[in-house]
């Protein structure tokens, strides 16, 4: 069981043939929600370069969480106002959680790992927020509804 003001959320997806499970642990603070830890496991067949694998997974987690937290795409006359990365807030360095990565090797087939960590980040974070606060978030970015520390 988690302590008061704590939440844990889980999400799973298949992305590009890679099964990915992500767990997000948060704490509700006076300054907003702090993402403490992310645990992620990805079944990629064969991990060819463990250091690169670890870094790609962590980058995907940060990218996915940043979009869930802060990035909104708005339109004017059918054209997106945000035209590149500098148009998005993203996740700040001080908001970046500890990320624990496990690569599951269940075969000889090599699969890509750059994108698969991104899709489960938002639902895992939303589930953690729900677990901690009882507030169900169904629209991104989440900073429209909650503050992040």
Regions found by a protein language model. Name each.
Residues 1-18, 23, 27-149:
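C-terminal catalytic domains of large/alpha subunits in multi-subunit enzymes
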């Amino acid at each position: 069981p988690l302590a008061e003001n704590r939440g844990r959320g889980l999400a799973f997806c298949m992305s590009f043939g890679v099964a990915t499970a992500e767990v997000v642990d948060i704490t509700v603070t006076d300054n907003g929600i702090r993402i403490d830890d992310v645990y992620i496991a990805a079944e990629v067949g064969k991990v060819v370069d463990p250091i690169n694998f670890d870094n790609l997974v962590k980058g995907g987690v940060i990218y996915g969480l940043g979009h869930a937290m802060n990035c909104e795409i708005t339109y004017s006359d059918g054209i997106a106002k945000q035209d590149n990365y500098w148009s998005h807030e993203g996740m700040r360095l001080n908001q970046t959680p500890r990320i624990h990565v496990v690569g599951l090797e269940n075969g000889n087939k090599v699969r890509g790992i750059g994108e698969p960590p991104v899709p489960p980040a938002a639902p895992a974070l939303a589930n953690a927020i729900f677990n901690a606060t009882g507030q169900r978030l169904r629209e991104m970015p989440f900073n429209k509804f909650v503050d992040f520390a």
